[in-house]
């Protein structure tokens, strides 16, 4: 008689405990199949609002709503067993008030079964982070370049280059730490600042275009796999997904047109 051994899923507190330990590995995931493949290798999977751009073809993340995040969050939960699943709170779902944030965050956790939510912002979101954490919702924060504020930044620009910007990001990091966030994504900031934040904060820093000295790293899975003609400077291509897909589909199309597919071994015949 075989005994099924369930796999224990990583928790937010376990991610927090990895501060200054072995680097934390994370990727975005939007579908069950990609979550299944990434799950054995990642400490957490982020169901990012970047799903709007990668999967749904939007120009920015701004059109993404809570229903879309829940749909993809459910898929990633079904596809994964081990990694903590963190779901982004989309633009407009948490900024109005802590109560609004709690209503949407609690719905995301209840409907998807995920282990945490992520929201963008520093000092101005500290009250909301505190409100959520005190009510049992684990929160990952996101500072530096925050894609939901892309219009405010005037595009996707490196952060922390001047003194005032540097000091603001430092203040943001301190505020979200004090508010109870269990980790913080640090995106597209100058490397010395990322190193300083990692040294000063008691919670893990998850770098994306920051520094290899951060407590962990995250990339958009499709960028890392080589999907798309362009990727940000901070992306290392570990595969050639788009090229492989193009080759496979082209070969399929040629076989269909030449009637080479399906072959006798791929069809059903009367015995």
From Swiss-Prot:
GO terms for molecular function: 3-methyl-2-oxobutanoate hydroxymethyltransferase activity; magnesium ion binding. Pathway: Cofactor biosynthesis; (R)-pantothenate biosynthesis; (R)-pantoate from 3-methyl-2-oxobutanoate: step 1/2. It is an enzyme of class 2 (transferase). InterPro entries: Pantoate_hydroxy_MeTrfase, Pyrv/PenolPyrv_kinase-like_dom, Pyrv_kinase-like_dom_sf. It comes from the Bacteria. Mg(2+) binds at residues 49, 88, 120. Its EC number is 2.1.2.11. Keywords: Cytoplasm, Magnesium, Metal-binding, Pantothenate biosynthesis, Transferase. The keyword Cytoplasm applies. The active site is at residue 187. One of its GO terms (biological process) is pantothenate biosynthetic process. Its cofactor is Mg(2+). It is found in: Cytoplasm. 3-methyl-2-oxobutanoate binds at residues 49-50, 88, 118. Binds 1 Mg(2+) ion per subunit. Its main location: cytoplasm. HAMAP family: PanB (MF_00156). Catalyzes the reversible reaction in which hydroxymethyl group from 5,10-methylenetetrahydrofolate is transferred onto alpha-ketoisovalerate to form ketopantoate. Homodecamer; pentamer of dimers. This is 3-methyl-2-oxobutanoate hydroxymethyltransferase. It comes from Bartonella bacilliformis (strain ATCC 35685 / KC583 / Herrer 020/F12,63). The lineage of its organism: Bacteria, Pseudomonadati, Pseudomonadota, Alphaproteobacteria, Hyphomicrobiales. The gene is panB.
């Amino acid at each position: 008689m075989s005994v099924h051994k369930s796999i224990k899923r990583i928790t937010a507190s376990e991610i927090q405990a990895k501060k200054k330990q072995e680097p934390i590995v994370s990727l975005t995931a939007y579908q069950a199949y990609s979550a299944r493949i990434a799950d054995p290798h990642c400490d957490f999977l982020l169901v990012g609002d970047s799903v709007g751009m990668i999967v749904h073809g939007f120009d920015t993340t701004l059109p993404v709503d809570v229903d879309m995040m829940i749909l993809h969050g459910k898929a990633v939960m079904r596809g994964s067993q081990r990694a903590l699943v963190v779901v982004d709170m989309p633009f407009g779902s948490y900024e109005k008030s802590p109560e609004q944030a709690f209503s949407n965050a609690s719905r995301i956790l209840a409907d998807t079964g995920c282990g945490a939510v992520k929201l963008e912002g520093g000092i101005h979101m500290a009250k909301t982070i505190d409100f959520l954490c005190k009510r049992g919702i684990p929160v990952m924060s996101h500072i530096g370049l925050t894609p939901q504020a892309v219009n405010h930044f005037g595009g996707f620009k490196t952060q922390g280059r001047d003194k005032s910007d540097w000091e603001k990001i430092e203040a943001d990091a301190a505020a979200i730490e004090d508010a109870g966030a269990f980790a913080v994504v640090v995106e597209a900031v100058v490397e010395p600042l990322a190193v300083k934040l990692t040294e000063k904060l008691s919670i893990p820093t998850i770098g994306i275009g920051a520094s290899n000295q951060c407590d962990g790293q995250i990339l958009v899975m499709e960028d890392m796999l080589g999907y798309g003609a362009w990727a940000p400077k901070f992306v290392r291509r570990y595969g050639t997904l788009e090229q492989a897909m193009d080759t496979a589909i082209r070969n399929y199309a040629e076989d269909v047109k030449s009637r080479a597919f399906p072959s006798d071994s791929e069809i059903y015949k009367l015995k």
